[in-house]
Amino acid sequence: MSTQTNTKSDFSELDWDKQDGLIPAVIQNHLSGKVLMLGYMDKAALEQTLATGDVTFFSRSKQRLWTKGETSGHTLKLVAIDKDCDNDSLLVQVLPNGPTCHKGTESCWLDGNAHPFLNNLAELIASRKGQSPESSYTASLFARGTKRIAQKVGEEGLETALAAATHDKEELVNEASDLMYHLLVLLEDQALSLSDITANLLARHQKAQRK
């Protein structure tokens, strides 16, 4: 997927003197919002990151520039970068190519989710797959198969639309919640996730911006 880098910050205002020429850079998955890692950049690392689109750090242990994934291939493609209000740290949004942590995990934190409930709900739904239909409503949906799950998505979509048409906001919230839940079940049934949907929406957005 091609990326369109968004760099609206004025990096000339960065305070490089506060930490001996280094600035911490928080790395965040652009699609999921998950925090992946923390690295440090000097001026050269920031310039190389902006020039190449591959996130580059200054390695304090190796005392040189280090492009993430230069040996593993697990690169971080730059999408957007911004500085904080004190001009002494960076938020770098990326599209990761493989696991970010050197231990082979997606994140260097056990739980780096920006929106943990939806992710946790999706994981809970996935855990119900293959369980006894009597154990939960979700398990019973999986047992009844794709057609029934798809039917429920259609029903909840119609009920959501009707709630909006009648300007019943309380019912709209309830029906939209039902729709979201059943959509997550359908995505899991088809071996897809919210990240797949987000990636597709991002690609469409970038295509529209290029026109």
From Swiss-Prot:
Residues covered by region (Phosphoribosyl-AMP cyclohydrolase): 1-117
Domain of life: Bacteria
Compartments where located: Cytoplasm
Gene Ontology biological-process annotations: L-histidine biosynthetic process
Matches recorded under CDD domains: NTP-PPase_HisIE_like (cd11534)
Signal peptide: none
Predominant location: cytoplasm
Catalytic activity: 1-(5-phospho-beta-D-ribosyl)-ATP + H2O = 1-(5-phospho-beta-D-ribosyl)-5'-AMP + diphosphate + H(+); 1-(5-phospho-beta-D-ribosyl)-5'-AMP + H2O = 1-(5-phospho-beta-D-ribosyl)-5-[(5-phospho-beta-D-ribosylamino)methylideneamino]imidazole-4-carboxamide
GO MF entries: ATP binding; phosphoribosyl-AMP cyclohydrolase activity; phosphoribosyl-ATP diphosphatase activity
Keywords tagged on the record: Amino-acid biosynthesis, ATP-binding, Cytoplasm, Histidine biosynthesis, Hydrolase, Multifunctional enzyme, Nucleotide-binding
Keyword Hydrolase appears in the UniProt entry: yes
GO cellular component, one term: cytoplasm
Annotated EC: 3.5.4.19, 3.6.1.31
Known pathway: Amino-acid biosynthesis; L-histidine biosynthesis; L-histidine from 5-phospho-alpha-D-ribose 1-diphosphate: step 2/9; Amino-acid biosynthesis; L-histidine biosynthesis; L-histidine from 5-phospho-alpha-D-ribose 1-diphosphate: step 3/9
Keyword Nucleotide-binding belongs to the record: yes
Classification via InterPro entries: His_synth_HisIE, HisE, PRib-ATP_PPHydrolase-like, PRib_AMP_CycHydrolase_dom, PRib_AMP_CycHydrolase_sf
Pfam families: PRA-CH, PRA-PH
Annotated region described as Phosphoribosyl-ATP pyrophosphohydrolase, given as residue ranges: 118-211
SUPFAM superfamilies for this protein: all-alpha NTP pyrophosphatases, HisI-like
PANTHER family, per database record: HISTIDINE BIOSYNTHESIS BIFUNCTIONAL PROTEIN (PTHR42945), HISTIDINE BIOSYNTHESIS BIFUNCTIONAL PROTEIN HISIE (PTHR42945:SF9)
Family: In the N-terminal section; belongs to the PRA-CH family. In the C-terminal section; belongs to the PRA-PH family.
Protein's name in the database: Histidine biosynthesis bifunctional protein HisIE
Organism: Shewanella oneidensis (strain ATCC 700550 / JCM 31522 / CIP 106686 / LMG 19005 / NCIMB 14063 / MR-1)
